[in-house]
Amino acid sequence: MDLLATLQCADQPGIVHAMTTAILNCGGNIIENQQFTDPTTKTFVMRTRFETSQGEKAANDSLDKELSRFSPSLSIRPTNQKPCALILVTKESHCLRDLLYLFELGELHIDIPLVVSNHIELKELVESHGIPFLHLPVSVENKSEQEKAILAKIAELKIDFVVLARYMQVLSQHFCTQMPGKIINIHHSFLPGFKGAKPYHQAHDRGVKIIGATAHFVTDELDEGPIIEQDVAHVSHSSTAEDLLAIGRDIERRVLAKAVKLYSEDRIFLVGKRTIIFS
């Protein structure tokens, strides 16, 4: 059996030795290992892929026995187990299309049991991929009720994380606190950058020379969550606002897809307001 273990705890001597001992004791063999100690917070993180003939329970028991004294946040799962993603969208399709395309190719190791939107425009696209589509229109009056409906679906479908693929609604503090570190958003700027409506028009008006996009975890502070992935492209004085929009869309879809892939492979560790990422 091929297993993946992730660990996070305060840095202290003996953690790596305990991990390797635990894997050896359950008949395991390490295939891949990455580790890092954050010098500021003294937090140790580790991602270890290993194989064992004794099964998941034996591995769990062995790791618990050897590592419990370090009081770690420890997770073990089969590498072929796919995390379950709920996608939220509005009207823009470029990020959603890319996620669905990569999902169909098998390049994203996730399951997508449902796509939810506050508009109806993307229903046909979603259902053409054999994925259920749920239309939940949002207004000032019903926003709280609709968020409760989404949270109910998250519980019902055992969703592991949420992807905001250009979902143009600000999630409430209550919603964000229900899934800390489990909601990924794509922001149309290389943060910090232009906020609000028409960011590419703002960028054009300021004569910027690079534009970009940022994928980050959602918190109750708008667009201030820990950054997962970023990318940029160079532009010039001859680039129109429409040029910037087209270039920006391409960056957005790539950055969001990379963030989803990193999350699905348990490569992201949250340490305060920062992320540690094993590529």
Predicted regions: what they are:
Residues Q12-E32:
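Short amphipathic alpha-helix segments
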Residues M1-D2, C26-Q35, T40:
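N-terminal short leaders/motifs
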Residues M1-A10:
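Short glycine-/aliphatic-rich beta-strand segments at the starts of folded cytosolic domains
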Residues F36-S279:
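One-carbon transfer enzymes
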